[in-house]
Amino acid sequence: MAHKLLNDTFLRALLRQPTDYTPIWLMRQAGRYLPEYNATRGRAGSFLGLAKSPAYATEVTLQPLDRYPLDAAILFSDILTVPDAMGLGLEFVTGEGPKFVRPVRTEDDVARLAVPDIDATLRYVTDAVREIRTALTDAQGRQRVPLIGFSGSPWTLACYMVEGGGSADFRTVKSMLYARPDLMHRILDVNARSVAAYLNAQIEAGAQAVMIFDTWGGALADGVYQRFSLQYIQQVVSQLKRDHGGEKVPVITFTKGGGLWLDEIAETGVDAVGLDWTVNLSKARERVGGKVALQGNIDPSVLFAPPASIRMEARAVLDSFGNHPGHVFNLGHGISQFTPPENVAELVDEVHRHSRAIRSGAHAPA
């Protein structure tokens, strides 16, 4: 599959096909733990200056690949580009994170929401996808690794849109959810249609897999999650292009704190489910029964440990999954900005080394 790809291990793993080793990429792999990223961000002048420049986005997307033999690149962007395109006025305040100038709080605010014109408002993202694909490809037309596109989930975007930024307790958005579920469903429907259009635009531009980040799904109660997050993830997935240019485009979804709902998430039509570090990978594999691939799920804090400990914990994750197709190694959440870059090299090397040993029979998982 994926002709001209020098390394298609990641895509094959997502489709539960046999691979010679377990592929690895890291959430937030292009980020502040890398000095070269910080240098580029300094030149860009701000985070938004970085994210909205296809040239800078391409530069930082490739930085971790130049350091480590990772098996996929992920578009450098931010999940809040979609509500920004809806006119909410995204700002990044130093020390406070993202803020929206015009949060969605009233019935009138909700009534004004509409699916943005992706080509007009988010062209910088699709341009970045095209530029990254070009930068990943050599003079002979051979691409190093696949490129992942992504978006936030409808619910996670709604959290930021209603709260006006990050939140410790989601009081404002949950108040709306329980007091005015009609308004919340309207927001989520607009978000779902927007996310589907956005991801399809990324696929058309050259993204070879896409991921839906449901970062705050785990903040919801059982039963509420299904109605206000999972239902809308399924709506997005049902609208996605699953083939482009004769190749399958796998879809991954990740609900942080969503281990409780693994069986239901696996029924949404996605190809792979991301797991955080609280989930037992062996039991998760048994639960989904080969229906989907699994991605994850080492604790990002392991990367603060000495190299021997990092390697031991990586082996434990690989042994837990065992010698089966359908595993993409990743962190259970995004990499910390305080991670020593040299420790990432230890992790990537051990994942490749130990998974090859498992495949060859030189090491039998417990």
From Swiss-Prot:
Q: Which UniProt keywords apply?
A: Cytoplasm, Decarboxylase, Lyase, Porphyrin biosynthesis
UniProt subcellular location: Cytoplasm
Q: Pathway, per Swiss-Prot/TrEMBL?
A: Porphyrin-containing compound metabolism; protoporphyrin-IX biosynthesis; coproporphyrinogen-III from 5-aminolevulinate: step 4/4
Site (Transition state stabilizer): which residue positions? Answer: D78
What SUPFAM superfamilies does this protein's entry cite? UROD/MetE-like
InterPro entries in the record: UROD/MetE-like_sf, Uroporphyrinogen_deCO2ase_HemE, Uroporphyrinogen_deCOase
Q: Which PROSITE patterns match?
A: UROD_1 (PS00906), UROD_2 (PS00907)
Q: What is its main location?
A: cytoplasm
Please give the superkingdom of this protein's source.
Bacteria
Write out the GO MF terms.
uroporphyrinogen decarboxylase activity
Q: Which chemical reaction does it catalyze?
A: uroporphyrinogen III + 4 H(+) = coproporphyrinogen III + 4 CO2
Q: Which residues bind substrate?
A: R28, Q29, A30, G31, R32, D78, Y160, T215, H333
- GO CC, one annotated term: cytosol
Q: What class of enzyme is it?
A: lyase
Enzyme Commission (EC) number: 4.1.1.37
Q: Which CDD domains match?
A: URO-D
What is any Pfam family matched here? URO-D
From the UniProt record, give one GO term of the biological process aspect. Answer: protoporphyrinogen IX biosynthetic process from glutamate
Q: Keyword Cytoplasm, does the record have it? A: yes
Q: Supply the NCBIfam families for this chain.
A: hemE (TIGR01464)
What is the annotated quaternary arrangement, including any partners? Homodimer.
Q: What does the protein in this record do?
A: Catalyzes the decarboxylation of four acetate groups of uroporphyrinogen-III to yield coproporphyrinogen-III.
Family in the record: Belongs to the uroporphyrinogen decarboxylase family.
* Name of the protein in its database record: Uroporphyrinogen decarboxylase
